[in-house]
Design a protein with these regions (language model features):
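Signature of N6-adenine DNA methyltransferases within the class I
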Residues: 3, 10, 70, 78, ...
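Flexible phosphate/Mg2+-sensing switch loops adjacent to catalytic phosphate-binding sites
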Residues: 9-58, 81-101
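Conserved SAM-binding motif I beta-strand of class I
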Residues: 60-63
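Conserved SAM/SAH-binding beta-strand->alpha-helix loop
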Residues: 66
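Conserved hydrophobic/aromatic beta-strand scaffold that supports enzyme active sites
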Residues: 232-236, 321, 335
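C-terminal segments that line or cap access tunnels to active or ligand-binding sites in enzymes
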Residues: 330-338
Length: 348
C-alpha cells in the first residue's frame, strides 16, 4: 500500500513539474514531445526544476508484524524511489543528486495493535492512515489476537463478536480525534453487515467519526497462486469536518450521497441491534447450525461409509448435515454428532 501510494503521488508530482516547465518555456504538449531526452536545458534558475522532488519515502510510515514483509516493504520503497527519480530526470533533462539507499525508510517491525502509533509518527505530522489489515473472523482468532481485541475494546458492548479488522478502525479513530487526519481501510464486508454494524459503527459515530466515502462489496482478486476467497469493502472515515461531497462506489459506478451509514447505504444512521428476547410471544431462537470445528466432524457420503466400515458402532451417531450448497445441489454431507455419546462408548 505504501509503495503504490508513493508511486501514485510521484507520478502526479512529475506531471505537475512537466506542466510547470511547459508553462515556463511557453510550449505545448506536442512541442514538448518533440524534445529528445538528450537535450540539455540551459540557464535553469527555477527552483521547481533545480529541486523538483517534494514527495519522499521519508514521508511514509508503516508498521509490519512480519520481519520478512517489513524488509520487502523497505526494499520496494527504495526501488520505487529509484524508478521515479529516473522519470523525473527525463522530465527536467538533467541529472539529479540521488544516492540509492541514502533515504531512510520508516517501516517498523511490530504488532500494530500494541505499538503506540505516535511513537512511530506524531499525529501532528500525520495526514492519512491507510491499510489492509488481516482478515480474521471473530470465532477464528488466536489467543493473542483475541487479547488484542479485548484490550482495544475494553468496556465495549459485544466486543467479543467483532472481527479482528475492527481493531484498526478503533485504533485509527482514537488517533484521529481532534485532528484533520483521514483514514481508509480495506476490510472484509463483515464490518458493514449484521451485528458488526451496531457493535462497531454506533460507538464510533457517537464519538464523532463519520464515513467520507466507501466502496461497497467487491471480490478480492490478486495474481497470487493461493488467492484469498473474501469479499471486501473500502471505507474512508474521519472525525474532522469534510467539505467534500460523500461518495459511494458500487459496481464501477460512483454516486454522490447525503450520508453513508454503517451498512454503506445512503440512509440515516440506523442500527439493527441484537436482542436475546423476542418482541412478541414466539419461541426464542438459538445459534443453530454453526460449523466451526474446522471440518473435522463433517463427512462426505464416501468418507462416512469408509469410517463406518472401520467403526460400525459409529453409524448411529452420523446425522445428515445441510448447508446452502448441500441443500441447493441435493448433495448432503454427514456430521459425526457425539453430543449423546457417553465417555464409556468413546473408549470402546
Amino acid at each position: 500500500f505504501l509503495t503504490e501510494t508513493y508511486l501514485s503521488l510521484r507520478r502526479m508530482e512529475n506531471e505537475i513539474v512537466r506542466s510547470l516547465i511547459d508553462a515556463r518555456e511557453g510550449r505545448t504538449k506536442d512541442q514538448r514531445d518533440q524534445i529528445t531526452a538528450g537535450q540539455i536545458m540551459w540557464g535553469i534558475t527555477d527552483s521547481t526544476v533545480l529541486e523538483p522532488i517534494k514527495v519522499s519515502i521519508q514521508q511514509f510510515y508503516g508498521i509490519e508484524i512480519n520481519d520478512f514483509a517489513a524488509t520487502v516493504a523497505k526494499t520496494a520503497l527504495w526501488i520505487a524511489e529509484s524508478q521515479m527519480m529516473k522519470q523525473t530526470e527525463e522530465i527536467v533533462q538533467m541529472p539529479l543528486d540521488f544516492l540509492p539507499l541514502k533515504s531512510y525508510v520508516n517501516i517498523f517491525e511490530g504488532n500494530a495493535l500494541r505499538v503506540d502509533w505516535e511513537s512511530v509518527v506524531p499525529k501532528g505530522r500525520l495526514n492519512y492512515i491507510m491499510g489492509n489489515p488481516p482478515f480474521v473472523g471473530a470465532r477464528l482468532m488466536s489467543k493473542e489476537q483475541k487479547a488484542d481485541v479485548n484490550t482495544l475494546f475494553a468496556g465495549w458492548k459485544n466486543a467479543g463478536n467483532l472481527d479482528y479488522v475492527c481493531c484498526w478502525y478503533k485504533k485509527a479513530s482514537d488517533l484521529m480525534r481532534d485532528t484533520a487526519i483521514r483514514s481508509a481501510l480495506v476490510s472484509t464486508n463483515s464490518v458493514s453487515q449484521g451485528e458488526s454494524v451496531a457493535n462497531l459503527w454506533k460507538p464510533l459515530f457517537e464519538a464523532g467519526i463519520h464515513i467520507d466515502f466507501a466502496y461497497r462489496t467487491f471480490r478480492w482478486d490478486s495474481e497470487a497462486s493461493q488467492k484469498a476467497h473474501v469479499h471486501c469493502v473500502i471505507i474512508g472515515f474521519s472525525s474532522a469536518a469534510n467539505p467534500k461531497e460523500k461518495v459511494l462506489y458500487s459496481g464501477g459506478h460512483a454516486q454522490i450521497v447525503h450520508n453513508i451509514n454503517g451498512y454503506l447505504l445512503d440512509m440515516d444512521n440506523v442500527f439493527v441491534e441484537s436482542r436475546n428476547k423476542p418482541l412478541c410471544n414466539v419461541p426464542e431462537i438459538g445459534i443453530g447450525n454453526k460449523p466451526i470445528d474446522g471440518g473435522n466432524y463433517l463427512f462426505t457420503q464416501e468418507e462416512m461409509e469408509a469410517f463406518v466400515q472401520k467403526e460400525p458402532q459409529a453409524q448411529k451417531y452420523f446425522k445428515p448435515w445441510y448447508g446452502s450448497q448441500e441443500f441447493i445441489n441435493r448433495c448432503p454431507r454427514y456430521c459425526l454428532w457425539l453430543g449423546e455419546c457417553t465417555p464409556s462408548e468413546l473408549k470402546k
